Amino acid sequence: MTTRYIFVTGGVVSSLGKGIAAASLAAILEARGLNVTIMKLDPYINVDPGTMSPTQHGEVFVTEDGAETDLDLGHYERFIRTKMNRRNNFTTGRIYEEVLRKERRGDYLGATIQVIPHITNAIKEKVLAGGEGHDVAIVEIGGTVGDIESLPFLESIRQLGVELGRDRTLFMHLTLVPFLGAAGEVKTKPTQHSVKELRSIGIAPDVLVCRGDRAIPANEKAKISLFCNVEERAVISLKDVDSIYKIPALLKAQGLDQLVTKRFGIDCKEADLAEWEKVVYQEANPVGEVTIGMVGKYIELPDAYKSVNEALKHAGLFNRVSVNIKYIDSQNVEAKGDEVLQGLDGILVPGGFGERGVEGKIMAAQFARENNLPYFGICLGMQVALIEFARHVAGLEGAHSTEFDKNTPHPVVGLITEWINEDGQVEERHEESDLGGTMRLGAQLCHLEEGTKAAAAYKSTTCVERHRHRYEVNNNYKERLEKAGLIFSGLSSDRSLVEMIELPNHPWFVAGQFHPEFTSTPRDGQPLFEGFVAAAYTYQKRDLED
């Protein structure tokens, strides 16, 4: 199979939406019957985002094979059916680490290691490997043209453009075309300068995607075409929209997919975007709404919970309701108590690390349990629910996780020292293990107990979900917690680790050690999120009736 490559760069400012644009183009090409994948090349020096602060970088998206990756890979999986893996995201740090390891082994036979050719060759090898087996590989380059960190990646794709030829490569550049209110017109000069910067390093863009708060007039498109040496039909206007799921239709309406397939000489069917039209319609026409309180510690940057936010919206689509997310700092719960939890239709406690705010999360779980308010716990959200139950129902005073209190009299949650990974191999950890890349990661099989809400949601006695954690339920307390009424509704593949808990006689008090948000998509949803939002809507209607 001959793979074609589309390289996506950005200019003028960061956060233009390269990832969304790349994913939307991929969705159209997939709708035309092509096998598409997307890669993200990140210019930072970290080996991966696994140990980066969520308030700086946003969430860490976990792939099926256990790679800790950029949140853009979540966008990719939500737009196309292809599952991402560790080949779909790599950083400058990863490249340098691998090149230096080869140098230490003597693989370069004493050569002087340089950015060109050694670093650029390593980048090209990864790009080509990531595209294998696909008709089209879209490669997004992180950062902005002109950033010093991006230069090795830009040089690498420039070389690939020469080596693979024009019939296998296409360069798509996103720029900003701002509207100046004082002048009453859009300004193309930033785009011209950005393209000039890109051309100065040897890359001539084939397509310009121009971002702005409004559609670009035809005369301005012609101006951009003239000054940037790009065909007028290849100047694409991408205005702000109220839903990212409208973007595939916007790009298709301007013929971007036809431009790509013609360039690559690919003969394929027309794109059918009926699934996306359905998503947009459902999003615009809810029959009700619910308010979900998300109790966390990284709420100053909602992107820290990007996949959770999107999964709640997807669940809203399947329940025909609009989901309003109220972000609640768990430290505010500690300071103000129940007053910050009023007026909610459900509480969700997402994953997280560290002691700060953990008692507020425990208080939120207690409030939901005692008031029959739908509760959904994810990863740490399951652990705090179990700690709360142990303290206040099972009578285990002072129960805690050893992550937060190593001297707790009842360590109901502790460090996992051994488990079976996705390949069936035994993995071991201890207190002194590195923080990076040492968690239980990736897709794991979970056995669900019949008759539980978990099994009912999945309509199955098994599920496969992705993990990212190093602490687990202490099995020494299982019997006592079960006697107090807690149901262990999900167990690991070898039934040695607790994966899910729930409460009987409660509208919805369900929690999982895994991260189901990573498998939610707007077209398919996710069973647990759908069940949670349905329970929240039912709770709201009953509350109004009362």
Curated annotation (Swiss-Prot):
<feature type="binding site">
    <location>
        <begin position="187"/>
        <end position="192"/>
    </location>
    <ligand>
        <name>UTP</name>
    </ligand>
</feature>
<feature type="binding site">
    <location>
        <position position="14"/>
    </location>
    <ligand>
        <name>UTP</name>
    </ligand>
</feature>
<feature type="binding site">
    <location>
        <position position="352"/>
    </location>
    <ligand>
        <name>L-glutamine</name>
    </ligand>
</feature>
<comment type="subunit">
    <text>Homotetramer.</text>
</comment>
<comment type="function">
    <text>Catalyzes the ATP-dependent amination of UTP to CTP with either L-glutamine or ammonia as the source of nitrogen. Regulates intracellular CTP levels through interactions with the four ribonucleotide triphosphates.</text>
</comment>
<feature type="binding site">
    <location>
        <position position="72"/>
    </location>
    <ligand>
        <name>ATP</name>
    </ligand>
</feature>
<dbReference type="GO" id="GO:0046872">
    <property type="term" value="F:metal ion binding"/>
</dbReference>
<dbReference type="GO" id="GO:0004359">
    <property type="term" value="F:glutaminase activity"/>
</dbReference>
<feature type="binding site">
    <location>
        <begin position="187"/>
        <end position="192"/>
    </location>
    <ligand>
        <name>CTP</name>
    </ligand>
</feature>
<dbReference type="GO" id="GO:0042802">
    <property type="term" value="F:identical protein binding"/>
</dbReference>
<feature type="active site" description="Nucleophile; for glutamine hydrolysis">
    <location>
        <position position="379"/>
    </location>
</feature>
<dbReference type="InterPro" id="IPR027417">
    <property type="entry name" value="P-loop_NTPase"/>
</dbReference>
<feature type="binding site">
    <location>
        <position position="470"/>
    </location>
    <ligand>
        <name>L-glutamine</name>
    </ligand>
</feature>
<feature type="binding site">
    <location>
        <begin position="15"/>
        <end position="20"/>
    </location>
    <ligand>
        <name>ATP</name>
    </ligand>
</feature>
<comment type="pathway">
    <text>Pyrimidine metabolism; CTP biosynthesis via de novo pathway; CTP from UDP: step 2/2.</text>
</comment>
<feature type="active site">
    <location>
        <position position="517"/>
    </location>
</feature>
<keyword id="KW-0436">Ligase</keyword>
<dbReference type="GO" id="GO:0005829">
    <property type="term" value="C:cytosol"/>
</dbReference>
<protein>
    <recommendedName>
        <fullName>CTP synthase</fullName>
        <ecNumber>6.3.4.2</ecNumber>
    </recommendedName>
</protein>
<dbReference type="InterPro" id="IPR033828">
    <property type="entry name" value="GATase1_CTP_Synthase"/>
</dbReference>
<dbReference type="GO" id="GO:0019856">
    <property type="term" value="P:pyrimidine nucleobase biosynthetic process"/>
</dbReference>
<feature type="region of interest" description="Amidoligase domain">
    <location>
        <begin position="1"/>
        <end position="266"/>
    </location>
</feature>
<feature type="binding site">
    <location>
        <position position="223"/>
    </location>
    <ligand>
        <name>UTP</name>
    </ligand>
</feature>
<feature type="binding site">
    <location>
        <position position="72"/>
    </location>
    <ligand>
        <name>Mg(2+)</name>
    </ligand>
</feature>
<dbReference type="Pfam" id="PF00117">
    <property type="entry name" value="GATase"/>
</dbReference>
<feature type="active site">
    <location>
        <position position="515"/>
    </location>
</feature>
<dbReference type="GO" id="GO:0044210">
    <property type="term" value="P:'de novo' CTP biosynthetic process"/>
</dbReference>
<keyword id="KW-0315">Glutamine amidotransferase</keyword>
<keyword id="KW-0665">Pyrimidine biosynthesis</keyword>
<keyword id="KW-0547">Nucleotide-binding</keyword>
<keyword id="KW-0479">Metal-binding</keyword>
<feature type="binding site">
    <location>
        <begin position="380"/>
        <end position="383"/>
    </location>
    <ligand>
        <name>L-glutamine</name>
    </ligand>
</feature>
<dbReference type="InterPro" id="IPR004468">
    <property type="entry name" value="CTP_synthase"/>
</dbReference>
<dbReference type="Pfam" id="PF06418">
    <property type="entry name" value="CTP_synth_N"/>
</dbReference>
<dbReference type="GO" id="GO:0003883">
    <property type="term" value="F:CTP synthase activity"/>
</dbReference>
<dbReference type="InterPro" id="IPR017926">
    <property type="entry name" value="GATASE"/>
</dbReference>
<feature type="binding site">
    <location>
        <position position="403"/>
    </location>
    <ligand>
        <name>L-glutamine</name>
    </ligand>
</feature>
<feature type="binding site">
    <location>
        <begin position="147"/>
        <end position="149"/>
    </location>
    <ligand>
        <name>CTP</name>
    </ligand>
</feature>
<feature type="binding site">
    <location>
        <position position="140"/>
    </location>
    <ligand>
        <name>Mg(2+)</name>
    </ligand>
</feature>
<dbReference type="InterPro" id="IPR029062">
    <property type="entry name" value="Class_I_gatase-like"/>
</dbReference>
<feature type="binding site">
    <location>
        <begin position="239"/>
        <end position="241"/>
    </location>
    <ligand>
        <name>ATP</name>
    </ligand>
</feature>
<comment type="similarity">
    <text>Belongs to the CTP synthase family.</text>
</comment>
